[in-house]
Amino acid sequence: MNGTSCVICDAGRFQAGGADMIFNFDNMEEKMIPEFKGGSGCFRPRMFSDEHMKIMRARLEPGASIGFHTHDTNSEIIFMLRGRGVVLYDDGAEELVAGQCHYCPKGHSHSLRNESAETIEFYAVVPEQ
């Protein structure tokens, strides 16, 4: 590698060393956030965040949603790991299934709903810009 020290995050604690920045979401506390961004049900993220970035693995139970919101100072990338959800964005809507990625650019709005009978799980990355 290039000899610079990177960071490893395990359960939210940092250690210098290693070649990559690694997040072990299984060791992070799962939060339960009701009606996130005005949505319904419970948003359940395991999350790393600092002043530059939020990186999370999250779940939405059947019938739960993340409310419609605008990304004024950042963008968001959602990669669906399991299940199928519905993404509402600006003035459209599309199904998002496991293996697909949704990108909401800075200045745009979106929401994610779980209209299925199973829990959905996804990664989300929100870089500040």
State what each model feature region is.
Residues 91-106:
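Short acidic-glycine-tyrosine-enriched beta hairpin
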Residues 84-86, 93, 109, 119:
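Structural motif
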Residues 65-67, 86, 102, 106-112:
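Histidine-centered metal-chelating micro-motifs
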